[in-house]
Amino acid sequence: MIITKETDYALRILRVLLDGEKHSVAEMSETELIPNQFAYQILRKLSAGNLVRVSRGALGGCELSCDLDATSLYDLMGVMGERGILCACMEPGYECHWQDKHGRCAIHCQLAALQQKQDEAFRAVSLRRLLTGGSNPQDTSTL
């Protein structure tokens, strides 16, 4: 799976925060159907990645701290610790015994080209566009 449940939950949290207001974890969990324990884990990552700001106390809550137009799906996946790798052999430092024995691997070359296109596509989609659907939510041709 390229986009994990964790990144899906992160997108849902960001969707709640689109309004620019502070929201409690309980509110976001209830609205977006995210288990509380996962919401806290995800918010820690989003905060560490400077995508959200979390404040504690009576007036605390969570709010956006990034520009969603300048932040891509690729960026979010990186914050969540995902690389969206198509195949294990795309991982840096992967040792392929087949390639060691036979040389160039056509499968790897084709997958590398697909990986590059996927990464470019994920970099081209801003989180705001993804979360709001842009001008026409049914039109995914430019995503």
Region roles according to the model:
Residues 3-34:
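N-terminal helix-turn-helix DNA-binding core of bacterial DNA-binding proteins
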Residues 25, 31, 56, 65, ...:
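Solvent-exposed interaction patches of small proteins and small membrane subunits
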Residues 28-30, 46, 76:
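Append "Primarily bacterial transcriptional regulators
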Residues 37:
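Key DNA-contact positions within bacterial/archaeal DNA-binding proteins
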Residues 42-49:
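Basic amphipathic alpha-helical segments that dock to polyanions
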Residues 49-65:
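Beta-hairpin "wing" of winged helix-turn-helix
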Residues 65-143:
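Non-DNA-binding regulatory cores of transcription-related proteins
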